[in-house]
Amino acid sequence: MQRSPLEKASVVSKLFFSWTRPILKKGYRQRLELSDIYQIPSADSADNLSEKLEREWDRELASKKNPKLINALRRCFFWRFTFYGILLYLGEVTKAVQPLLLGRIIASYDPDNKTERSIAIYLGIGLCLLFIVRTLLLHPAIFGLHHIGMQMRIAMFSLIYKKTLKLSSRVLDKISIGQLVSLLSNNLNKFDEGLALAHFVWIAPLQVALLMGLIWELLQASAFCGLGFLIVLALFQAGLGRMMMKYRDQRAGKINERLVITSEMIENIQSVKAYCWEEAMEKIIENLRQTELKLTRKAAYVRYFNSSAFFFSGFFVVFLSVLPYALIKGIVLRKIFTTISFCIVLRMAVTRQFPWAVQTWYDSLGAINKIQDFLQKQEYKTLEYNLTTTEVVMENVTAFWEEGFGELFEKAKQNNNNRKASNGDDNLFFSNFSLLGTPVLKDINFKIERGQLLAVAGSTGAGKTSLLMMIMGELEPSEGKIKHSGRISFCSQFSWIMPGTIKENIIFGVSYDEYRYRSVIKACQLEEDISKFAEKDNIVLGEGGITLSGGQRARISLARAVYKDADLYLLDSPFGYLDVLTEKEIFESCVCKLMANKTRILVTSKMEHLKKADKILILHEGSSYFYGTFSELQNLRPDFSSKLMGYDSFDQFSSERRNSILTETLRRFSLEGDAPVSWTETKKQSFKQTGEFGEKRKNSILNSINSIRKFSIVQKTPLQMNGIEEDSDEPLERRLSLVPDSEQGEAILPRISMINTGPALQVRRRQSVLNMMTHSVNQGQSVHRKTTASTRKVSLAPQANLTELDIYSRRLSQETGLEISEEINEEDLKECFFDDMESIPAVTTWNTYLRYITLHKSLIFVLIWCLVIFLAEVAASLVVLWLLGNTPFQDKGNSTYSRNNSYAVIITNTSSYYVFYIYVGVADTLLALGFFRGLPLVHTLITVSKMLHHKMLHSVLQAPMSTLNTLKAGGILNRFSKDIAILDDLLPLTIFDFIQLLLIVIGAIAVVSVLQPYIFLATVPVIAAFILLRAYFLQTSQQLKQLESAGRSPIFTHLVTSLKGLWTLRAFGRQPYFETLFHKALNLHTANWFLYLSTLRWFQMRIEMIFVIFFIAVTFISILTTGEGEGTVGIILTLAMNIMSTLQWAVNSSIDVDSLMRSVSRVFKFIDMPTEEGKPTKSTKAYRNGQLSKVMIIENSHVKKDDIWPSGGQMTIKDLTAKYIEGGNAILENISFSISPGQRVGLLGRTGSGKSTLLSAFLRLLNTEGEIQIDGVSWDSITLQQWRKAFGVIPQKVFIFTGTFRKNLDPYEQWSDQEIWKVADEVGLRSVIEQFPGKLDFVLVDGGCVLSHGHKQLMCLARSVLSKAKILLLDEPSAHLDPVTYQIIRRALKQAFADCTVILCEHRIEAMLECQQFLVIEENKVRQYDSIQKLLNEKSLFRQAISHSDRVKLFPHRNSSKYKSQPQIASLKEETEEEVQETRL
């Protein structure tokens, strides 16, 4: 970034904002890069501002029992706020004085007042000087207030972020991500621009009092008629506002429903295509859209009348003020024109400025109170560690996640002790205690010595993660003692990847040790993965490790924990995403060898891990079921297998957690997070649902990204659980959009209660967030000294061979710390923003306007009609002026003022009636025409929005996956949320306002030009100057706005990243570093926003300067060319003053229109996406006719109509090559094999080898080459829809959309209830559905949060059975299941798909044993394709992965004694199946 010219700018340059000229010139000539943006002034840095406010807030906390945040803000900003308020008031006062001089100028034309005529020229000079003074006062004042608002926002942003990192986990349990984002965006954004209006809460009343005094002097009591009307008008507008809010609230629920379905569709677009559900989803969404648009039109009409009321109120104000006076004393033109000018100012003060100011204070104080409450939340407390101990000890530890239960626990226990003394009832305590809440851990005792390995196992929800959280201090014990040395390293069960390089993620701020680093890389099996990257371990990872597989993310997280030199290592199910072979190698080389001398606590349930552990702790429902060695476990607890049921590899996922609230860390951010709800909780929350989707969505966030969802940071209590749980293998950033898309656009959908402006939700970015905030600094003090900005030292390891693509800016200090400079790596930033900025021009093209206007044929006629009415209005106005100029006047004796009978100044009583009749008649006609003009325009523009939404939805659904893979999910969602909201809400009325203002200006200029043709000569160059200045400014401002909008992304993304890894951050003590990164993100945004505000003020000031010149010309032309006794000067000057404010408003509206039209450009970009080939046309035609066929009819000349295809399920694959995007690297190369009908084939390969990719290639979801045949029919000779219908799919990412059970099973409504129940019975789903009220009509929300992952997979099975598929594709169906539920699915597979071809991708060996053939994929190619016997006889990957016990299961005859126990375990599983059916929810 460049150094800001502001630092060296002169006072004059600062006053006129001339220092922004270089960036304006550069932006006009070329596209702006981030390197062109100026550095922020040091006073605006987040470090300085946050430190200042934090100091005052701490002072407030220390000095008062009831601290007020507003007091801290007052001490920081009050005097500057007051100073700019006084400037603003003085500027507003000049507006009230201007009409006085205007009246004197008109009065100077009175023939009897010759003395005044001589000073008219001086009065004109004074009037012009008032405009100059007003310009010099208002713009610095407005900019100063915007600047203060920006500083307040930055300081509070930082304060909130710092507080977030300190919040206790119990508080986090009650706060959703959506609430935090709303706190940062919706609330704090009010300060930036709203602060400039705050002073009008006292300025407007003073101004009204001054104006009424001046009007009273002119019109006496008549003055209050106009004021009364304005007050009534303000109340009327308030009433319209309430009505509009009612419609908006109703509409927000409908929007939420649509966006929920749309979000689910986008996130699961691959499943939608695999199931051939494109038309079904389109119909569902369009039906919701239709209902939404009815309310949209009502709200738009109310807003239209509200806006029109302001435009058309001017006539009534003047009319009501002047009429009583004119009827009594006649019309005095001087007083009329002066009153008109006063009323213009008065109308603005009463109907706009004061209501806006009141609303600003209301919103601001509300936001401050919310932030104040947040800042007083309970903070995380670190445990007091015993640094002398070497062991880890827990003694009688009991804990609750629910806040306050600890105190109740002690009280109940005390009462229990008192009662036991009297009645001896030992069980009384826990009978009382059950009323208080369930402890997540009860009476836990264990002791492990230094260097020992403790394996913690247990069933789902047993409290294993809570145990680790207790040791880390995240969960406070209600009773008992915990002792350990305090140096802890932690690996979360959900792999958390910090945006940065692989090396930075592993080192994570610890001093760099090459030998240790290489040892950890090797032990965690990362060497091979890293070697595949061109940049090796310096490759930049996206947010959440978007470019990595789940297994790679898990190994990096484990490596981070192992690299840190600690006394105690807490490993929470670190092997979740690893294949069997990799897991085995890492456990041996890393956990058992590399960490052999360290104390380790490992959450696991694998038998091999339990055997190697020094001690084993088995938890069951929060209690210690067993503690001891493995041999003791076998002797004392022979039934321990049943306690591990429902666990196995499922442990690392939160899908089935039922009891504890926070035990599964950041549940909503898990890659496979289902709703952890118990059956009792299900009844509390889910049985209240109705058929209306919106009933359970009162607190949803509409992502604008995002994402339309309320993501809880932790699992919420049953009454709070309104969030959405995702079954997603995709990283979070593919689903969660927390920041606005970088494209320009102001409107979004924040909360369900209101549609307003604010940030929209956005998704993953290609580059690291740290790219946005840091820049490499060469080693050496000399370079560092060149950086004038402040630096902040944080701990981070240095690296050798730094390149300019490095994320961190670093300098090795003696304390192995890091100096992060304020410099930004522009190249990385440019690359990071490239996606958002490309292919959207800085200024909306004329082609976009033309395409938008011609989209609906009625729109052109409406615009022509508007022009015709405008011409009629101008003609009527000229007629009125002609009548005024030619009104006959009475004799001198009959005139009101006997000394004057000139029509230029006085019109008599008799003529006044005549004039007013004409004026009122014409004005009423114009009002009626005006309303008639606007309504059709607004109505038609909403219809255009409807068409654009339909076209875009259709294009997205029909786009190939290769195209969709290049887009960000949040970016797509923003089109349907933010951009459609702009098209619905803002664009129609903004276009109406612009057209209205433009016509007013043109009409005023036309009238003035008719009265004084010389003025027209002055008008032409002024209008030309306006157009050129607008074009010059717009080119730069839109780019700055685009950069500013993109600059918001790192702020919210960094917040989410920090929250996702909050426990890891605390365990590693990295809060200060992440605070620094957050300040970097804030400073980046501030640089763009401050420059945008400055250039905007430059533009506004130039507009005023041009007008001042124009007004000077008009004033002197009028004074010098108006002859004796003519009164047209009053009309000319009054209209000229009106032109000033209206033309500025019109120019600003044109800029708003251009900004909002960028949303149209983005929508057109999506509409123009390519479509998949082979799309049947019959269904499309049926849809266009408003009817959606229940059965899709596809003609295929290669298949006889009498045949049922596919009949057997035989597959032949020849030279299959697959790529994710056109021109990308091949993921699979030259795959060839064949599958016999009814055969079961297992896919084997290491993590990331391409197993899931092969299944996607079968469905033609990727760019593929080669050939596949099913029963002799090639995929090239059949339509895409029919090809996909041949497959049944159970994907990793189970798709349950918001809708009934029936709709989820049969979206095309092809099957009767009897057929659906029959299939549900076949797959074991009937008992699940019957437990819900409404059964098939029960509405599933939040991704089916009331269902376990196993039940969701059963629904996928049911869909496949209903589709009559002959080939079934299963992608790791057991990855998130306990063995019991998986047994149910295996049984369903055997029964429902006995004669089908099954292709299974699975990590669990037991699940693969039923396959006849195995396809081993290695290095993107087929390595082996053989039966299981051949693979076991060779040194294959399968043989390495399978354990001896699994081989015994395969060949029981080789060792019958070892196999005897198998039937017992199998029978145990069978016994529990029915129990699972009843309790699995």
Swiss-Prot record:
Keywords: ATP-binding, Cell membrane, Chloride, Chloride channel, Endoplasmic reticulum, Endosome, Glycoprotein, Ion channel, Ion transport, Isomerase, Isopeptide bond, Lipoprotein, Membrane, Nucleotide-binding, Nucleus, Palmitate, Phosphoprotein, Repeat, Transmembrane, Transmembrane helix, Transport, Ubl conjugation
Record-listed cross-link Glycyl lysine isopeptide (Lys-Gly) (interchain with G-Cter in ubiquitin), residues: 688
Region ranges (Interaction with GORASP2): 1387-1481
Acidic residues compositional bias, start-end: 1471-1481
Class in the EC hierarchy, top level: isomerase
Disulfide cysteine pairs (residue numbers): none
Extracellular face of the membrane: 99-122, 217-222, 320-339, 880-918, 1012-1013, 1117-1130
Membrane topology: Multi-pass membrane protein
Name this protein carries in UniProt: Cystic fibrosis transmembrane conductance regulator
